[in-house]
Amino acid sequence: MTQVNRLDGGLIDRSTPLSFTFDGRRYGGFAGDTLASALVANGVRLVGRSFKYHRPRGIISAGSEEPNGLVELRTGARREPNSRVTMTELHDGLVATSQNRFPSLGFDLMAVNDRLSNFLGAGFYYKTFMWPKAFWERVYEPIIRRAAGLGALSGEDDPDVYDRGFR
């Protein structure tokens, strides 16, 4: 396992190598790594896109305040969106997928918003998409929400068992 950015020392257990997947590519790390530290060690710099303009974003901090590294964790039917890469402990077989991109993180078609940024001022959608009124809930709002970049739930049955349920 070649990790160009891996430093000597640290609080990881180098005797326990782990493998994980990020956006369909397999990488390696060690027990005690976070997803962020393993990605940085493997030379992965691009982990997300900005919400409005879809500009490329990388990891800039090591704590829970990290704004750029939101991923979706998958395990069978379970999907956990909006997980922070700096707070996700690495485990063998971890599957993480970046969010807020279409079709891929490296080539995001929504990045055209960056080129149109002069025309997309704050709250532009409240002024622009007012007519016809019936289009707001059925057309405009779903498109804007999809472009906003937060994760989506799986839609499959929750495999967990709970003591109580509320509806």
Segment roles from a protein language model:
Residues M1-L18, F22-A31, N42-P81:
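Ubiquitin-like/PB1-type beta-grasp interaction modules and other compact soluble beta-rich domains
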Residues T34-A36:
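Short, structural beta-strand-to-alpha-helix junction motif
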Residues L39:
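Carbohydrate-associated surface elements
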Residues F51-R167:
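Fe-S ferredoxin-like electron-transfer domains
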